[in-house]
């Protein structure tokens, strides 16, 4: 062990013990254990013996092993902080930006994901994928297809395979022309699933794509309903009553679907609260 690091480690241990002692009496909801708290950045570096890259790897591993199936909005908020910290410690961390793109925006943490992806885009000048996911989030979550297409075109010079470059430029052109549509989101998520090495993570992404396909079915039926009835939907069950769907599609995550103020079907990202 490096003796010169001993005082740093002792201070880190003292800070950690103090933080745990203060936090144990603070009331908080029951949460998934992997994402209960985000430590200050200087504490993370101190606990890693002053090595910011080791601290980034520890934070990235923490995000990787988190059990997303049982996490609540507060957990995802903490995961967003953890992954932002990893990006600050090592903006070129590959696993961190990939996990951020695949999980955070789909669970209400779009800004956290964009922060991670923006830093990865600047640090990984050889890698087009952080720019692609950043552009996709602008398109799908922020619903700003023009800005998304402009970002996507920045990825094109980094692509080494000519056919892939053409494909990216074609997507950018479609975003400029068409705007928001769920089927584009399905294609991106399925592409990420095909690249995923972990089988559990692959299934998670495939389920996410299945959920988006169901949303597309609802939106197409809602458009036909509005064309026939000359008014927007007031309730999703009207699609069944009008004979446009035999039954409403089920959300594989169990959260369900709803209508926005314009009568457009949307995804719910948390269980609906039943009135007491």
Q: Each predicted region: which residue ranges?
A:
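Structural signature of tandem alpha-helical TPR/SEL1-like repeats
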Residues: 75-78, 108-116, 143-151, 181-183
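Inward-facing hydrophobic residues that define packing positions of alpha-helical scaffold repeats
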Residues: 79, 83, 100, 117, ...
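Short coil turns that delineate tetratricopeptide repeat
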Residues: 91, 125-126, 159-163, 196-197
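N-terminal alpha-helical interaction modules that lie
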Residues: 1-94, 106-108, 272-275
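Alpha-solenoid helical repeat scaffolds
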Residues: 98-99, 114-115, 128-135, 146-150, ...
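Low-complexity, acidic interaction segments enriched in glycine
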Residues: 106, 119-121, 181-187, 196-276
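Short coil/turn linking the two alpha-helices of tandem helical-hairpin repeats
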Residues: 64, 68-72, 101-109, 128, ...
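Canonical positions in the second alpha-helix
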Residues: 85-86, 119-120, 154-158, 191-192
């Amino acid at each position: 062990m490096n003796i010169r690091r001993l005082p740093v480690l002792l201070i880190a241990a003292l800070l950690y013990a103090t933080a745990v002692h203060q936090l144990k009496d603070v009331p908080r909801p029951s949460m998934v254990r992997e994402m209960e708290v985000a430590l200050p950045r200087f504490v993370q570096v101190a606990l890693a013996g002053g090595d910011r890259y080791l601290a980034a790897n520890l934070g990235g591993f923490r995000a990787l092993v988190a059990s997303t199936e049982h996490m609540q909005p507060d957990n995802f908020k903490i995961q967003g902080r953890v992954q932002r910290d990893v990006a600050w410690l090592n903006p070129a961390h590959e696993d961190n930006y990939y996990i951020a793109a695949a999980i955070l925006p789909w669970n209400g943490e779009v800004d956290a994901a964009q922060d991670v992806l923006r830093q990865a885009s600047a640090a990984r000048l050889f890698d087009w994928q952080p720019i692609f996911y950043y552009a996709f989030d602008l398109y799908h979550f922020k619903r700003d297809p023009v800005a998304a297409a402009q970002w996507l075109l920045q990825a094109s010079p980094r692509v080494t395979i000519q056919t892939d470059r053409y494909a990216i430029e074609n997507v950018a052109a479609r975003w400029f022309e068409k705007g928001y549509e769920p089927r584009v989101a399905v294609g991106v998520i399925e592409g990420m699933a095909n690249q995923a090495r972990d089988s559990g993570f692959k299934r998670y992404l495939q389920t996410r794509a299945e959920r988006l396909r169901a949303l597309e079915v609802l939106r197409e039926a809602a458009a036909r309903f509005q064309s026939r009835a000359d008014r927007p939907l007031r309730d999703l069950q009207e699609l069944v009553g009008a004979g446009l769907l035999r039954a409403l599609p089920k959300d594989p995550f169990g959260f369900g679907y709803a209508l926005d103020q314009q009568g457009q079907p949307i995804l719910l990202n948390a269980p609906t609260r039943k009135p007491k």
